[in-house]
């Protein structure tokens, strides 16, 4: 049997909320593999360094991740009262989202399936 009453269990679960500033983008129109190329480059870096890497990266995913970094930094400053100069990228990951299926007509009546993949990208910052 459970150790406590249902409301007490809920209270305890809600007490251990993650207070780190973060930003999440769901249904980003970029595949997980392509997003991870950029995310691997910025993981563990300071916020300024990560923004510099992302700004000069030619990949499409980097433009999305740049907005996410700026959003997470604004969340840290406004919601958590953190100093932007001390922030660094603690966690960043991309999870698989849904896939849109499209048909590409080919020769002699054939049709190839095109899969347009999506991902859910999360960036978590913290102070050093």
From Swiss-Prot:
Record text on subunit structure and interactions: Part of the 50S ribosomal subunit.
Q: Name one GO molecular function term.
A: rRNA binding
Q: In UniProt terms, what function does this protein have? A: This protein binds specifically to 23S rRNA; its binding is stimulated by other ribosomal proteins, e.g. L4, L17, and L20. It is important during the early stages of 50S assembly. It makes multiple contacts with different domains of the 23S rRNA in the assembled 50S subunit and ribosome. The globular domain of the protein is located near the polypeptide exit tunnel on the outside of the subunit, while an extended beta-hairpin is found that lines the wall of the exit tunnel in the center of the 70S ribosome.
**Where is composition skewed (Basic and acidic residues) in this entry?**
9-20
Provide the GO biological process annotations: translation
Quote the SUPFAM superfamilies the UniProt record gives. Answer: Ribosomal protein L22 (SSF54843)
- Origin species: Lachnospira eligens (strain ATCC 27750 / DSM 3376 / VPI C15-48 / C15-B4) (Eubacterium eligens)
**Which of UniProt's keywords are assigned here?**
Ribonucleoprotein, Ribosomal protein, RNA-binding, rRNA-binding
Q: Which GO terms describe its cellular component?
A: cytosolic large ribosomal subunit
Which stretches does the entry tag as region Disordered? 1-20
Organism superkingdom: Bacteria
Q: What is this protein called?
A: Large ribosomal subunit protein uL22
Q: Which family does it belong to?
A: Belongs to the universal ribosomal protein uL22 family.
Q: Which Pfam families does its entry note?
A: Ribosomal_L22
